Design a protein with these regions (language model features):
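Soluble N-terminal domains of membrane-associated systems
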Residues: 1-95
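Alpha-helical transmembrane segments and immediately membrane-proximal extracytoplasmic
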Residues: 63-76, 109, 113, 117-118, ...
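Interfacial loop-to-helix junctions that mark the boundaries of transmembrane helices
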Residues: 68-71, 133-139, 192-196, 254-255
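Helix-loop-helix junctions within the multi-pass membrane cores of secondary transporters/permeases
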Residues: 95-105, 111-121
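C-terminal ends of transmembrane helices
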Residues: 106-107, 150-163, 211-224
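Core alpha-helical transmembrane segments of integral membrane proteins
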Residues: 112-187
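Generic detector of multi-pass transmembrane helix bundles and their immediately adjacent loops
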Residues: 185-255
Length: 255
């Protein structure tokens, strides 16, 4: 029974890591650490970007297995850090398997940052990158406004009763931010439309996903790396498509 609980704890830790943006090698390493800490020396794990497969060979007649399907999702690095810290504490013998599972459930249910904090962070990130790429103070102010409203728009779209696909959400985000950037620019708030758009687009850029894809490929986890890379490139394409549609229409009308 304790072996099964230990395997469940390792699987749950791996699931939380994979769901929240951890690299494949980190997931496998954490699973192995936790399993061995609970005396499961015969454990073997196989991790993909969308699934975890763990087995434990107790003896010739007894095997334990745990399979988890993990859909692609957004990153929550606080949860990744919490699981990493927990795995270190498990190695020191601080938790029994049952206690570790309870802590992992608490980590899994860890609340996100408040909506207000997320909106402000989106605006500040947009403003900073707008300025970093050569925009003026007024461009940064405009990017802050657009970036903040973009996050509100994304929150509304993602909470609709009818589920919005990732493709449509990112195309819609590109359409929204570009339309709002043009409106703000035409009202005379910013100096350069391109810099406003560049700053405002930052909340949609899949930076963590792209970085993890490259790291997975560098660590020879080719299947997971390619899947994550395709996902990141698809997001980038959808955002660019949304921006491009509005800019094309705007320039045709302006001319």
């Amino acid at each position: 029974m304790e072996d099964k609980e230990g395997l469940d704890a390792a699987a749950l830790a791996g699931r939380i890591l994979l769901q929240n943006g951890a690299e494949i090698f980190r997931v496998e390493e954490t699973i192995e650490r936790i399993a061995k800490s609970y005396g499961m020396e015969g454990n073997s794990s196989f991790v993909l970007s969308s699934g975890i497969f763990i087995t434990e060979e107790k003896d010739d007649k007894h095997f334990y297995a745990n399979v988890k399907h993990i859909p692609l999702s957004t990153a929550h690095l606080d949860k990744v850090a919490a699981v990493n810290q927990l795995s270190r504490e498990i190695e020191t013998g601080k938790y029994t398997p049952a206690e570790a599972i309870e802590v992992l459930h608490n980590i899994q249910n860890m609340p996100e940052k408040s909506k207000t904090a997320q909106i402000i962070a989106s605006g500040v990130g947009s403003a900073c990158f707008g300025y970093l790429f050569g925009g003026s103070i007024f461009d940064s102010f405009a990017a802050f406004f657009v970036g903040s409203l973009l996050w509100v728009f994304l929150g509304i779209m993602s909470k609709r009763k009818k589920r919005t696909t990732k493709i449509m959400l990112n195309i819609g985000g590109g359409l929204f931010l570009t339309t709002l950037s043009i409106l703000v620019y035409r009202l005379g708030i910013g100096d350069n439309l391109n810099h406003i758009i560049i700053g405002s687009i930052i909340p949609l850029v899949p930076g963590v996903a792209f970085t993890n894809a490259i790291r997975d490929i560098a660590n020879e986890d080719y299947i997971s790396g390619i899947v994550r890379l395709v996902d990141a490139l698809l997001i980038a394409f959808c955002v660019a498509l949304g921006v491009g549609i509005i800019m094309t229409v705007y320039h045709r009308i302006a001319v």
